[in-house]
Regions:
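Conserved C-terminal structural/oligomerization subdomain of aldehyde/semialdehyde dehydrogenase
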Residues: 1-121
Length: 121
């Protein structure tokens, strides 16, 4: 697929076992879009290998689940690459997109000990 299409589209690619890594490379490099993806496999090692190899290939990845399987309000959701900024709507991490955090610490007791490390009591 070369375009991002929002609609009921499914792509099924059947590959030979010997072509697994080549297929993962095709998935990872064939499009600039990366909203969601699903991996169906009975072999847990294959799932882990695919996840490691496709780390940046989709904002959300589903194992043995349809790629529209996000649980709204319970599972962070957001696309990567040209499909978004990979901010996860529904997660506290989306908050950091709109703020610049600054930490402030104030001592109300008075500073008497200047030794280091200062975190020891």
């Amino acid at each position: 697929m070369r375009e991002e299409i929002f609609g009921p589209v499914v792509t099924v690619y059947v590959y030979e076992d010997a072509s697994f890594d080549e297929t993962l490379e095709l998935i990872d490099e064939s499009t600039e879009y990366a909203l969601t993806g699903s991996i169906f496999a009975r072999d847990r090692k294959a799932l882990i290998h695919a996840t490691d190899r496709l780390r940046n290939a989709a904002g959300n990845v589903y194992y043995n689940e349809k790629c529209t399987g996000a649980v709204v309000g319970q599972q962070p959701f957001g696309g990567a690459r040209a499909s978004g900024t990979n901010d996860k709507a529904g997660s506290v991490s989306i908050f950091w997109r709109f703020v610049s955090a600054r930490s402030i610490k104030e001592n109300f007791v008075g500073l008497e000990d200047f030794s280091y490390p200062s975190n020891l009591v």
